[in-house]
């Protein structure tokens, strides 16, 4: 449970139903109304955070589902009520710190501390089994050779994985890695050679510290040189992602057929290549009903944490802190649905997956083996994905695992099926470049891609 806050009496008042009584903590709000400017907001943020912590201290939160859900709402309310995106970084950092402490106190981490007590594995070379990321994903992949196959695989997978919330991502080439653009750019800067080039020797893939340092530099430029200083960290990063700048975000959709459209999208360069459709679990398979309730509460808290001016994960500067919030453990993938400031977001049912670079230790690595027992190296896994991606079969119900790693699923779409699937998606759902990219950027790309056909069709 939570530590006693300095100056606070142990425990706290609760009502007869076991919920926290927050009446005695209303004074910070009253004081805020009497004050003015950023100092008042700073005091309110700090006092409210402490009030919430004190109120929940007596509760055995991991066993009380309503309390867990209430904490998520409280966290969101704190951020919403104080108009926090307009606060200075220092003030917002204090409020964010309070919420991080709240999450830690609630003991919501799904991963086991013992799995990350050992020193993280050093960089490694590729194993002989990996000639491309596609080799890693192929071990458990489903094969789609027609629209009928696609329907069956999606229906079977969503039925088998009912207890796991899924998001979807389509990629035009089955041999591409599941990498964020920031991870990919940093890997190139650090001199990583992809497995397709058959390199010999250790591969220095980016660490979480590398990612954080790059993000800090990018945010500094955005706020100091371009003066985008009033946006939250997540909104800044999301807008940069939309404009093609490198970020740690992975574009996903909550609609499997939209993801399939991205996988089979017409492309002179990739039409002859197999495509890949990913289904990413955002939480582990729950081991108990209580764990399933915790998944819901964790999602609510995750939403609140994405509202900070500074990225909350920048404060997680040790392995222990990252494990406490399941950052880079594979046990939690934050899914952020951005505001609909862009027409593509609604059209694509879009969201972003957010997670830390995997923390590979010897104890965790044992969960990453091929179906024939082959052990994948750290380089193999990072060459394949910038987040934990433990693959499962689409034909069986995914079991819970000791490390509480969220499941991932892979579907290979044969190149010969791309045209049929593309035509059926347009006929059944109206998916086309015009509907998926309903803006001038999409129009420009379409004209560039289909210029000859457009001119040939005439006015």
Summary of predicted features, one role per range:
Residues 2-9, 26-33, 39-459:
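Catalytic-core elements of nucleic-acid end-processing and repair enzymes
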Residues 12-25:
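Extracellular calcium-associated, cysteine-rich motifs in secreted modular proteins
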């Amino acid at each position: 449970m939570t530590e006693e806050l300095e100056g606070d009496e142990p425990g706290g008042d609760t009502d007869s139903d076991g919920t926290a009584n927050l009446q005695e903590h209303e004074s910070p709000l009253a004081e805020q109304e009497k004050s003015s400017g950023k100092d008042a907001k700073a005091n309110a943020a700090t006092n409210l955070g402490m009030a919430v912590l004190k109120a929940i201290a007596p509760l055995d939160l991991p066993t009380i589902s309503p309390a867990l859900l209430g904490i998520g709402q409280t966290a969101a309310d704190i951020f919403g009520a104080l108009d926090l995106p307009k606060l200075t970084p220092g003030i917002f950092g204090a409020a964010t710190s309070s919420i991080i402490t709240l999450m830690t106190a609630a003991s919501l981490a799904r991963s086991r501390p013992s799995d990350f007590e050992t020193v993280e594995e050093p960089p490694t070379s590729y194993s002989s089994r990996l000639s491309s990321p596609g080799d890693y994903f192929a071990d458990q992949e489903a094969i789609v050779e027609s629209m009928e196959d696609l329907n069956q695989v999606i229906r079977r997978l969503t039925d088998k994985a009912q207890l796991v919330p899924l998001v979807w991502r389509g990629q035009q080439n089955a041999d591409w890695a599941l990498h964020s653009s920031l991870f990919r750019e940093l890997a190139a800067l650090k001199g990583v050679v992809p497995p397709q080039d058959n390199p010999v020797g250790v591969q220095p893939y980016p660490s979480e510290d590398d990612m954080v340092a790059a993000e800090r530099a990018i945010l500094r430029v955005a706020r100091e040189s371009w003066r985008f200083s009033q946006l939250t960290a997540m909104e800044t990063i999301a807008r940069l992602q939309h404009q093609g700048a490198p970020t740690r975000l992975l574009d996903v959709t909550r609609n499997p057929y939209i993801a399939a459209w991205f996988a089979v999208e017409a492309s002179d360069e990739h039409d002859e290549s197999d495509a890949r459709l990913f289904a990413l679990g955002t939480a582990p398979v729950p081991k108990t009903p209580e764990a399933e309730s915790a998944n819901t509460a964790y999602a609510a808290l995750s939403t609140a944490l994405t509202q900070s001016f500074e990225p909350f994960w920048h404060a997680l500067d040790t392995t222990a802190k990252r494990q406490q919030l399941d950052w880079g453990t594979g046990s939690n993938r934050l899914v952020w649905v951005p505001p609909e400031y862009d027409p593509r977001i609604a059209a694509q049912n879009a969201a972003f997956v957010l997670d830390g670079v995997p923390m590979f230790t010897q104890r965790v690595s044992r969960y990453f083996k091929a179906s024939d027992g082959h052990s994948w190296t750290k380089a193999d896994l990072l060459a394949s994905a910038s987040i934990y991606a433990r693959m499962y079969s689409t034909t069986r119900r995914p079991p819970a695992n000791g490390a509480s790693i969220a499941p991932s699923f892979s579907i290979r779409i044969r190149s010969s099926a791309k045209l049929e699937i593309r035509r059926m998606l347009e006929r059944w759902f109206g998916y086309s470049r015009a509907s998926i990219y309903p803006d001038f950027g999409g129009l420009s790309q379409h004209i560039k891609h289909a210029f000859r056909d457009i001119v040939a069709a005439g006015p």
